[in-house]
């Protein structure tokens, strides 16, 4: 059986049920991350922002800080913390460069890279300024 045409790209690769479940898990994780960051005083500038270098899960702002946020949802805390590989960090750095090129008014802000870890039955964990390029 072919997946529906409106299904996310991940669902069209391999097993449709697994891809769709992963897509939904990602949406729920990003929603939890948005709620956490809003409670901490951040304003969401963009969600699932697509750039030529790749997708940025969240772009948030608080004061003069502009954060590119990667959301990682895993079954265990250690797996979530280790899920962001150096290759993905470089991709996010390139995507952030595209973001700043597309929206030059953000260039005056202090750019940083954050990670939000989502683990079942635990509070989401926000790692502000998780790495420096």
Swiss-Prot record:
GO MF entry, a single one: nucleic acid binding
Gene3D superfamilies, alphabetized: 3.40.1350.10
Pfam families: UPF0102
InterPro entries: Restrct_endonuc-II-like (IPR011335), tRNA_endonuc-like_dom_sf (IPR011856), UPF0102_YraN-like (IPR003509)
Cross-referenced NCBIfam families: PRK12497.1-5
Family affiliation: Belongs to the UPF0102 family.
Descriptive protein name: UPF0102 protein Plav_3586
Organism whose genome encodes this protein: Parvibaculum lavamentivorans (strain DS-1 / DSM 13023 / NCIMB 13966)
